[in-house]
Amino acid sequence: LVTSDAHPGLVRAVSEVFQGAAWQRCVVHLMRDCARAAGSRQLSRRVSRIVAPVFRLKEAGAVRAAYHLAVDMLGSCCPEAAAVLEETEPDALAYLDFPPSHWKRLRTNNVQERANREIKRRSRVVQVFPSASSLERLAGAVMCDMDEAWSDARYFSEARMAELYDERQRGANGEPLSEEQLEGFRLVARQAIEASLQLADMLEAA
């Protein structure tokens, strides 16, 4: 699984270099794209309040139900944001195919964003580069340092990685969800989004 924003060049590079890998669209960037589609600041805040709770839910069924509900709710107040959300569903929810304990690290590209911030921080010290190659050397040095740090660190423990195998085994033998289970997920989804909107209304009224 490769996680990134939806920049066309990145998406194309992932498909060419990591053939067969799934692609996860960073949900933070997705929420920003939805909010940007709203136009006005007030509507943008409402869009964010509808979308954000979707990715905080802890069960895959509830996340999917909330995603569909968010698309429906956005359709009545901001069709542009609804179109963005609906179009990207398979890529935005790719992380749900992995164990829940992995979700927090898979659904955003925070690791890459931290690397970008470090390059910006180091380049601000220099301010003016004499050539493009000097900038490339600095960025390359930063990435080499990070690669060394990442190679010594364990992102997931062995127990967490074992969960992935167990999850795949259960998925292969899993039963489809009943209508009662689906309705329960829809209820959880509605409660989560409505609670987020109520909190927003209370904060604006205060």
Predicted segments with their positions:
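Catalytic center-proximal scaffold of phosphoryl-transfer enzymes
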Residues: 1-206
